[in-house]
Amino acid sequence: MLLATFKLCAGSSYRHVRNMKGLRHQAVLALGQELNRRALGGPTSGSWINQVRRRSSLLGSQLEDTFYSDQDLAYIQQGEEAMQRALDILSNQEGWKKESRQENGDEVLSKVIPDVGKVFRLEVVVDQPMERLYEELVERMEAMGEWNPSVKKIKILQKIGKDTVITHELAAEAAGNLVGPRDFVSVRCTKRRGSVCVLAGMATDFGEMPEQKGVIRAEHGPTCMVLHPLAGSPSKTKLTWLLSIDLKGWLPKTIINQVLSQTQVDFANHLRKRLESRPALEARC
């Protein structure tokens, strides 16, 4: 009940304060503080999904004393909405079908979501502390092309506050070049609630990065990675990756499903190799 009220209050208040000239920024800060106060006062849940969903609120962590333009606020809202939608999908345990399971226990599941399409869910355990994964996936985001063959380049186009960025990602060809060059422009939102880190995002429009010649502009749906220490083994990390992509173009569904499922398996393997070969930074999420 609190979560439903939480979302409704945040959404309607956000639209209202955007039209309040002169008082917009102060109203947003007050709203965020009040929502956080109410959320943190709620009952404790044993589920890490509910822990994040309950404490994550629209604009709730954007409390630094900074002025945001209307466009900045729109990006922040979009990132928060992507996170909430992705966590909603992950929190529903019904209807998931097994795509593959590796000898090391890595598992890919899939599910068809109305108005979203087929999504894929990677479940892995990485023999590294959560902070190490955060360093590579957030602090070193633009270096992902160095270790992930599925990515040619990632560039941060704009930073908004401490939680939100706009990125441009150029993906490599896949399936023996049957899937040609794609790129993505996305808004990404990063949060930590207790011992859980969530990295979420979805496609967005960014005027300074128009479509590129010879490259198909694909779109991320609501997607996220959830990181938290493995129960009983805090030096290990449980990683859950919800992947939702519209590759655009004329591609058979069988090829799309095969590419996306294998992309997740390969990602886990390449991430492990990267973490083993690189020193840690002094970073905390």
UniProtKB/Swiss-Prot annotation:
One of its GO terms (molecular function) is cholesterol binding. It catalyses: cholesterol(in) = cholesterol(out). GO terms for cellular component: mitochondrion. The modification Phosphoserine is found at residues 57, 195. PROSITE patterns: START. The keyword Mitochondrion applies. One of its GO terms (biological process) is intracellular cholesterol transport. Expressed in adult and fetal steroidogenic tissues, including adult testes and ovaries and adult adrenal glands as well as steroidogenic tissues of pregnancy, including developing fetal testes, corpus luteum, and pregnancy, but not in the fetal ovary. Keywords: Lipid transport, Lipid-binding, Mitochondrion, Phosphoprotein, Steroidogenesis, Transit peptide, Transport. May interact with TSPO. This is Steroidogenic acute regulatory protein, mitochondrial. It comes from Sus scrofa (Pig). The lineage of its organism: Eukaryota, Metazoa, Chordata, Craniata, Vertebrata. The gene is STAR.
